Structure formats: C-alpha cells, structure tokens
C-alpha cells in the first residue's frame, strides 16, 4: 500500500473517528466505496469523497498531505455546495470521469438494501434520487 493511500486512510480516521450513523461506523461507507475501485487513485478519491462535506477537513489539508491535483479536483467536485441544486451537481460531475466513477460507487452503496433498511430518513426518496443520479452518471461513462 502506498504512502498516499495510507494518508487517505489516516484522514478518514481523523475525519470520522468513532462517529456512528444508522447503527454503523460512519467511515465504513468510505471503505466500501473504496473497495469498488480499481486503481489507487480511484481508491484515494473514494476514501476522501465526503471528508470536505462531512468533517472539519479542508481542501488545504488534502493539498498539504501531497495528493495530486487530479485527486483533489475529484474530491472537490464530489463536494456539493449548498447553493447548487442536486441534479445540477450530478450533471457537473459527468465532466470529471474520476469523480463520476466514485459517485456511481457511492450511489450504489447508498442504495444497498441492507444499508437503506438501517437509515432513519426518507429512504424511498433517497432511492429515487440515487437511481435518477445513477442513470445520469452511467449515461456519461
């Protein structure tokens, strides 16, 4: 395992610690998305895909860790801004193949029946949104 992949894992541990959501460690989602990736670059982006949005980690922390511009751009693209409408964000992701691949894996993990059954919010709405997003992103591949 490379130093950068180890750094990504360390950042995930720092970002999420012992946080639990829907009955499981929050970081498990990042590791499942990583497991669906082929290359180390994809694995790193998969691990980091939510850290800017769901923790105190900042973009400069990723830069300081030595991740490539391509990795940082993908993580940044995967971070949805509050002012951006969700499906506009999904459409924008289609411009970045690395971010698209990670988002597809994330959506599939979000739609996993076992995970959905543990979620405490509107799962049907989530499933519909995930499926529509998958259709957009898979059409871009």
Residues covered by each model-derived region:
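Active-site helical microenvironments for divalent-metal-assisted chemistry
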Residues: 1-141
